Amino acid sequence: MIILVDAMGGDNAPEAIVNGCLDAVSEADGFEILLIGDEGKIREILNKRSYDTSRIKIHHASEVITVEDTPTKAIKTKKDSSMVVGFKLLKEKKGDIFLSCGNSGALMTGALFILGRIKGVDRPAIGAIVPTKAGKGLIIDAGLNTVCKPVNYQQFGIMGSIYMKEMLGIENPKVGLLNIGAEVGKGNETLKQAYSLLSESNINFVGNVEGNDVALGKVDVVVCDGFTGNVLLKFYEGAGSYFYNLIKGIMLKNLKTKMAALMLKKDMKVLKKIMDADENGGAPILGVDGLVFKSHGSSNARTVKNVIIKASKFAETKALDKIRQEFVNMEVEDIEQDL
């Protein structure tokens, strides 16, 4: 397996990206990494550490797409950027999955222009994993589509259900529509129509869910528009950091609590791993005709390492093929109904 990595995308590139890749290959097996970007800068970082040269290679790209760039213009004009080159290598099957911490708009635009949508998919979406009382849940869409049509919600639910089944092994994922109330008929007209479409879909749709239901793990897949999903995701990350540091502060308040903290040291590490955004970072763009993973622009080396390992596991699944097949089946069903 070859993981294509945009070495120049993100606030902390290329240092955090390259070091994260080095950490990933030292911790996990089963994949190679092709770093795409300025070869001189990448090699300078690589030379500071010892690593298995058979597992990390470089593909030079002379340009960088920054957060200041207009997505469509950047994809069309910066042909030798690390992001565009990465997409082209993926399309040419020179790699199995592409990972970038770069400009989100450009990543979406590049995925659509170069890879294209899976046939039948109207709008791709980001699926972000978050910790819940039940284990883990998926927020979809987590930031790509700020305005959605009813059919988009339906397709998000289908793709999210397949992802959770293939990635986490949940046999029949429960899917809920994020709304202002759990009762049928809640929300605006778009959400009401989305509810009807989801109800008719071949997934385990359990109805509307409210914001508090997400953390309680009442569903495995939370369907929403990208604006709402991104706000929910960022709140999740901020709240996790706040509560962990709040507990940590209380535990270190005095001698008595410090003694208790010493006994709970291992448990605190488990808690940190559950609540830490660096542990849960990285999300697939579902619906494009290729495996693409997005991570925060602020990703550090630890985040990148974790995302690469997660991306490698995603590439091992049959999620992309299953999504393709599901939309083929839906198209056949629509034709049969028309007849």
Swiss-Prot record:
GO terms for cellular component: cytoplasm. It comes from the Bacteria. It catalyses: a fatty acyl-[ACP] + phosphate = an acyl phosphate + holo-[ACP]. It is an enzyme of class 2 (transferase). Pfam families: FA_synthesis. Keywords: Cytoplasm, Lipid biosynthesis, Lipid metabolism, Phospholipid biosynthesis, Phospholipid metabolism, Transferase. Its EC number is 2.3.1.274. One of its GO terms (biological process) is phospholipid biosynthetic process. InterPro entries: FA_synthesis, Phospholipid_synth_PlsX-like. It is found in: Cytoplasm. Its main location: cytoplasm. Gene3D superfamilies: Isopropylmalate Dehydrogenase. GO terms for molecular function: phosphate:acyl-[acyl carrier protein] acyltransferase activity. Homodimer. Probably interacts with PlsY. Catalyzes the reversible formation of acyl-phosphate (acyl-PO(4)) from acyl-[acyl-carrier-protein] (acyl-ACP). This enzyme utilizes acyl-ACP as fatty acyl donor, but not acyl-CoA. Belongs to the PlsX family. This is Phosphate acyltransferase. The gene is plsX.
